UniProtKB/Swiss-Prot annotation:
PANTHER family (UniProt xref): LARGE RIBOSOMAL SUBUNIT PROTEIN UL2M, RIBOSOMAL PROTEIN L2
Annotated protein name in UniProt: Large ribosomal subunit protein uL2
Taxonomy of the source species: Bacteria, Pseudomonadati, Pseudomonadota, Gammaproteobacteria, Cellvibrionales
Keyword RNA-binding: yes
Oligomer status and interactors: Part of the 50S ribosomal subunit. Forms a bridge to the 30S subunit in the 70S ribosome.
Region (Disordered): 34-59, 223-275
A cellular component term, taken from the record's GO annotations: large ribosomal subunit
Swiss-Prot/TrEMBL keywords: Ribonucleoprotein, Ribosomal protein, RNA-binding, rRNA-binding
GO biological process: cytoplasmic translation
MF (Gene Ontology): rRNA binding; structural constituent of ribosome; transferase activity
Functional note: One of the primary rRNA binding proteins. Required for association of the 30S and 50S subunits to form the 70S ribosome, for tRNA binding and peptide bond formation. It has been suggested to have peptidyltransferase activity; this is somewhat controversial. Makes several contacts with the 16S rRNA in the 70S ribosome.
UniProt family annotation: Belongs to the universal ribosomal protein uL2 family.
Length: 275
């Protein structure tokens, strides 16, 4: 996909770098697969902020994505590729032979007119979904289930992919982009190929307002606050915070381990690489 740098006709355009995909559908999305998406502004049912830096942004509809890919043995034709404001990857509208339409995460290289299918007997082809026990070792995959039938949870964002490196007994071993090696049941499903829109990481929004259009509010540094608001706040003049970095609630940050799901530790063969 071509990457466009804008002519600096204004300060807000000077640093804009956008990724343009001419193959994306330019009309409205498929209405029966849309859902209302209301904004919370980061507040809970008491009106209190539970997630900071959320608010405003353009109105959006949620696109119902088929993460389970459980319509087995029925081929589907890709009608078009679409932009989805709810995720970094592009999505594809597919029409099954029985007339049903669904949205799926579009893999890299998929285009309008292609055919895909799901199930044990599916061909080894980009866009097809099948259990890990039927995927050749060494294959690049995405949209992987962690529990059979639950729906895809791993490798769903733009450019994401995982490599199947081994299969032994009832478990398959996956190598994630982070360097982590993880075991997953062989009955879990995965889609062949990598996720589309891999150039997403090259874009630059160019100005603060573009972030506000996406519903992201400013992040204020702790050292710029008062002591009542943050452990790094206060002091005469500019300070460095005076202690190791912590969150507003005093939890160490910048590298502090917070993973507490011991139940699934046994599935991790090797921890991810340190950055």
């Amino acid at each position: 996909m071509p990457i466009q740098k804008r002519k600096p006709t204004s300060a807000g355009r000077r640093f804009v770098v956008s990724v343009v995909n001419p193959d994306l559908h330019k009309g409205a999305p498929y209405a029966p697969l849309l859902e209302k998406k209301s904004k919370s502004g980061g507040r809970n049912n008491n009106g209190r902020i539970t997630t900071r830096h959320i608010g405003g942004g353009h109105k959006q509809h949620y696109r119902k994505i088929d993460f389970k890919r459980n319509k087995d043995g029925i081929p589907a034709k890709v009608e078009r590729l679409e932009y989805d404001p709810n995720r970094t990857a592009h999505i594809a509208l597919v029409c099954y032979a029985d007339g049903e339409r669904r949205y799926i995460i579009a893999p890299k290289g998929l285009k309008a007119g292609d055919f895909i299918e799901s199930g044990d007997a599916s061909a080894i082809k980009v866009g097809n979904t099948l259990p890990l026990r039927n995927v050749p070792v060494g294959s690049v995959i995405h949209c992987i289930e962690l529990k059979p039938g639950k729906g895809a949870q791993l490798a769903r964002s733009a450019g994401a992919s995982v490599q199947l490196v081994a299969r032994e007994g009832q478990y398959a071993t996956l190598r994630l982009r982070s360097g982590e090696m993880r075991k997953v049941e062989v009955e879990c499903r995965a889609t062949l190929g990598e996720v589309s829109n891999s150039e997403h990481s090259l874009r630059s929004l160019g100005k603060a307002g573009a972030k506000r259009w996406r519903g992201v509010r400013p992040t204020v540094r702790g050292v710029a606050m008062n002591p009542v608001d943050h452990p790094h706040g206060g002091g005469e003049g500019r300070t460095s915070g005076g202690r190791h970095p912590v969150s507003p609630w005093g939890t160490p940050t910048k590298g502090y381990k917070t993973r507490s799901n011991k139940r699934t530790d046994k599935m991790i063969v090797r921890r991810r690489n340190k950055k």
